[in-house]
């Protein structure tokens, strides 16, 4: 796909909306727009948001999960990039579920709902999935503050990879290729001082 002059939708969380960037112009969406001469980078990032549905939905913007926001994005865009999963691990209430799930109430189900919805809405257009980056507490099955044990971050990454493979969607596996590892002191100091946001 020729990126120059194209419109790309970016659906994501705090990293997409620019937390950790020193200015709006330094958000990865804006950097990509300049580097590839996009006509427009539509930023649909909401800090703290999750792919899967919360059990109790509040009026807080971050409780508007990716599945809820699917139909709010510019349908005329030439491509879509989805970057998420870290908040599902960190503080999401949804259980993991099983591969057969198709409801946003589980992480598996939400991944299916989102990816199939994107394929239906953006027929013939590229939809790219980005896996979560490593984070400081990625091995804690309680995430940031869950009162119950669910799974480490690598399990959420694995589900994203599995469901994307099922739908034939390309994946940029940032967990495996970003070079960011907050458990390494030098990497954390240079690339993500808070252990989460680059």
Feature map (PLM): residue ranges:
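A short helix->loop->beta-strand "cap" motif at the edges of active sites that frequently abuts
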Residues: 38, 119-127
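Active-site phosphate/pyrophosphate- and oxyanion-stabilizing loops and adjacent acidic/basic residues
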Residues: 30, 116, 158-161
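Generic structural signal for well-ordered alpha-helices
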Residues: 70, 111-115, 157
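Solvent-exposed polar/charged
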Residues: 34, 120, 162-165
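Catalytic His-Asp segment of secreted/periplasmic serine-dependent ester chemistry enzymes
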Residues: 132-198
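Conserved SGNH/GDSL esterase-like catalytic core that processes O-acyl groups on lipids
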Residues: 2, 7-9, 15-109, 197
């Amino acid at each position: 796909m020729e990126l120059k002059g194209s419109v790309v939708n970016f659906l994501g969380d705090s990293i997409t909306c620019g937390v950790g960037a020193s200015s709006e112009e330094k958000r990865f969406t804006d950097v990509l727009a300049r580097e590839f001469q996009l006509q427009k980078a539509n930023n649909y990032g909401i800090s703290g948001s999750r792919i899967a549905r919360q059990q109790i939905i509040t009026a807080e913007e971050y409780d508007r999960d990716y599945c809820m926001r699917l139909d709010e994005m510019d349908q005329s865009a030439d491509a879509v990039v989805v970057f998420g999963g870290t908040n599902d691990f960190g503080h999401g209430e949804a259980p993991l579920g099983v591969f057969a799930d198709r409801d946003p109430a589980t992480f598996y189900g939400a991944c299916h709902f989102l990816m199939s919805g994107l394929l239906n809405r953006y027929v013939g257009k590229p939809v790219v999935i980005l896996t979560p980056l490593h984070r400081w507490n990625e091995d804690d099955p309680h995430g940031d503050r869950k009162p119950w044990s669910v799974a480490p971050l690598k399990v959420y990454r694995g589900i994203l990879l599995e469901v994307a493979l099922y739908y034939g969607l390309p994946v940029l596996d940032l967990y495996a290729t970003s070079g960011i590892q907050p458990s390494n002191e030098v990497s954390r100091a240079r690339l993500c001082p808070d252990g989460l946001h680059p």
